[in-house]
Amino acid sequence: MPRLPGRGGPLMLFDSARRGTAASAPTGTGTMYVCGITPYDATHLGHAATMITFDLIQRVWRDAGLDVTYVQNVTDIDDPLLERAARDGEDWKVLAMRETALFREDMEALRIIPPEHYVGAVESIPDIAERVLMLVKEGAAYRLEDGTGDVYFDISATPRFGYESHLSREQMLEIFPERGGDPDRAGKRDPLDPLLWRGARADEPSWPGGDLGPGRPGWHIECAVIALNLLGAQIDVQGGGNDLIFPHHECSAAHAELLTGQTPFARHYVHAGMIGLDGEKMSKSRGNLVFVSRLRADQVDPMAVRLALMSGHYHSDRSWNDELLATAQKRLGRWRKAAAMPCGPSAEAFLAALRGRLADDLDSPGALAAADSWAEAALVGVGDDPAAPTLFTRALDALLGVRL
């Protein structure tokens, strides 16, 4: 990330728990945990948009003089991964490694600053099992009496359950089964209780769990434990797509808060909107996913993809289409022509505007408009500052992650 003159200001971010914008004010080091992929398929544009959002946070923090400790998990053991491997007759470990490698290649192409720590769920299982046992001993978790060895979290153990998502119980019950929950599981104390530990099953991978018995962890506890181990009891940002607000982030925060006794787990719960295709929701079931690797193979400039995804505000659901990409390609071309001019209007005002827009809840559309204004002026011969094109180029690289 290139150094820029001066420093940016504090970053305001929308927090799902507050349902409003507040300053993210880390002192010295900003800590961020972002839920990564389940590596059974290639990186689609929804993944890319989410990762660009948190890349912008990291860039704005660093520009403000902060160090950043950024952790991202890889859910390298989960039912969808096992199901895809079985369908394709492939070893699940090989599938996970291949798709994780492709994801990282896609992120590099999009100029995402990598996390300081990429952590797989599998490597974290011993720590996760230990924390699940702690919850059992504290009375916040229980083992089913059906002989499966399955352990569930008791949501009644935390009176704060629901503070992040602000959903009614009826809404939770509707969403829970759509996002991996099992409200109809016999023997649970509450239909919304999430799985902490799945006891070993025939033909499924499992790991030693000490007093839990062999098995594998549930999804929510994986993220809670990885974040606690690497970032501590409280973090500045927990992030992901807005489909993770409930149950995933609600449950992982509940787990972490019960384990540490500190609230809130995250000072900001930040969620990126979903990406649709031509006005329809983009999903695996619809078969309309657009993959970053496919665009790259079609010789689409990754910087144009990045620009297209930043042309809408991160917090909003938005749509991808050919027109959006074409507009981004034209914008990128104009910026490159402007940056190649021998001189231009002073870029200091542009840098201040760029910083100001990004500090206001990552207003990337406003940031792009500021860059457009400078480029248009430069292209018609306004200004005679020979250093301006270089500063323009460096600012776009550092703050927007766009290399001209």
Curated annotation (Swiss-Prot):
'HIGH' region (motif): residue ranges: 37-47
Motif ('ERGGDP' region): 178-183
Gene Ontology molecular function, alphabetical: ATP binding; cysteine-glucosaminylinositol ligase activity; cysteine-tRNA ligase activity; zinc ion binding
Enzyme Commission (EC) number: 6.3.1.13
One GO BP: cysteinyl-tRNA aminoacylation
Motif 'KMSKS' region mapped to chain: 281-285
A cellular component annotation (GO) from this entry: cytosol
Residues binding L-cysteinyl-5'-AMP, per UniProt: 35-38, 50, 73-75, 219, 241-243, 275
Keyword Repeat tagged: no
Keywords assigned: ATP-binding, Ligase, Metal-binding, Nucleotide-binding, Zinc
Domain of life: Bacteria
Annotated Pfam families: tRNA-synt_1e
Binding site for Zn(2+): 35, 223, 248
Stated role: Catalyzes the ATP-dependent condensation of GlcN-Ins and L-cysteine to form L-Cys-GlcN-Ins.
Similarity remark: Belongs to the class-I aminoacyl-tRNA synthetase family. MshC subfamily.
Protein name per UniProt: L-cysteine:1D-myo-inositol 2-amino-2-deoxy-alpha-D-glucopyranoside ligase
Organism: Salinispora tropica (strain ATCC BAA-916 / DSM 44818 / JCM 13857 / NBRC 105044 / CNB-440)
Recorded name of the encoding gene: mshC
